[in-house]
Amino acid sequence: MKKLESSLKNMALALTGFSVIAGGLLGWVNNVTAEPIAQANAKILSDAIAVVVPGFDNNPAEAPESVEVEGVSYKIYKATKGGEFIGAAVESSSMGFGGELKVLVGFDPEGKIIDYSLLSHSETPGLGSKAAEWFKKGAKGDITGKNPGEKALTVSKDGGDVDAITASTITSRAFLVAVNKAFEAYKNQSANNETK
């Protein structure tokens, strides 16, 4: 086989050919994996809703509502049992030390926190990931049963009554900001439903 001459034209053709092949392969892989990824994410969300608002008999993930608070849109998943409203799960996020921290917070009809699930974070491994358990029932920073409408949740370092994660105050603040934002969305959604 004859060797091609090293010229600008031949290099451009070779680079274009490689780019087209690589782009086609990436597009194909994206097409093949998009549906399984979407299904896995839907299952993660459904499982998280079941943790933060247990005992429902509807499918809250099927018909989320969107509520806008201060220009930010929040998804709210209403849970019912026997047609009665038993609570809602609210997706919220805020910026922590390493990036976005995304949570799903469950509220009962009175606005008390039932539970939460840390959906994703970009915090320091080993520190930021502690938020997944630190604020759970019985843990050191337990927020379950609290109503952010009565008093916004803040860390004790800022005059609040929630213990921050050891060596991770910024993450703790970000987590509590996300929980407080979730409550605001929940409260606005509840107010909107009462006026309809």
Question: For each predicted feature, which ranges?
Answer:
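Flexible, solvent-exposed loop/hinge segments and secondary-structure transition points
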Residues: K2-K196
